[in-house]
Regions:
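Histidine-centered active-site microenvironments of extracellular/periplasmic hydrolases
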Residues: 1-40, 50
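C-terminal, low-complexity/hydrophilic appendages and adjacent surface loops
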Residues: 21-29, 95-137, 174-196
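Polar, surface-exposed loop/tail segments
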Residues: 38-104, 141-150, 164-169
Length: 196
């Protein structure tokens, strides 16, 4: 998984901070795969893919595409693994299932929205790959923020399950110690255990 090692003053995963962060160092995950005779060795790909793409990819690689459940996000990246071209993906939507933080990322832009209170972020990744200059709130980017937020919210309206949607979850920086929605455990994850 992604792990910040001091970038932005953060040590650990994105869901272990308050507010939760969506810096690339916390959310980007290297993906390595080997299947001699099926996938060419030493292939490097810089296309944007998501964990949602793993299921359709594995099903296609194994000849089981017809077993793909309907209504799920994600698309196969088998062509990329084989060094072939495929239609370019414009965006990847990321969410933090342990709290109300969502992000949409294109090759050029990243928009982070924290429900309900902010701090929201907008980064121009071409000019600012280290995500140091937050452009959110600048008037010249208002239309872009509206477009990115709309695309992100449309994705969640299509694919999220309201019963476990983290957008309404409390945020406390405890990472995976808390569960979203109907699976939430409302206890202090930092309280000493077995002490009266």
């Amino acid at each position: 998984n992604g792990m910040s090692m001091g970038q932005h003053g953060v040590w650990g995963k994105g869901n272990g901070t308050f507010p939760m962060n969506m810096y690339d160092s916390a959310v980007k995950v290297p993906f390595l795969i080997s299947w001699p005779g099926h996938i060419p060795a030493n292939t490097v790909c810089s296309e944007m893919i998501s964990a949602c793409d793993l299921l359709p990819t594995i099903l296609k690689l194994t000849g089981l595409s017809d077993k793909q459940p309907t209504g799920l996000p994600g698309r196969s990246f088998t062509e990329l693994l084989k060094g072939e071209q495929r239609e370019h993906r414009d965006e990847v939507v990321i969410f933090d299932e342990y709290g109300p933080v969502r992000m949409i990322r294109t090759k050029e832009w990243k928009y982070v929205h924290r429900y309900p209170y902010g701090k929201h972020e907008l980064y121009h990744l071409v000019d600012d790959p280290g995500e140091e200059k937050n452009l959110y709130g600048l008037p010249e980017y208002k239309k872009l923020v509206t477009q990115l937020k709309g695309r992100m919210e449309k994705w969640f309206c299509t694919y999220s399950d309201p019963a476990i949607d983290g957008v309404r979850s409390a945020v406390n920086g405890s990472g995976q110690l808390c569960r979203p929605g109907v699976y939430a455990i409302y206890e202090d994850p930092f309280a000493p255990k077995g002490v009266e």
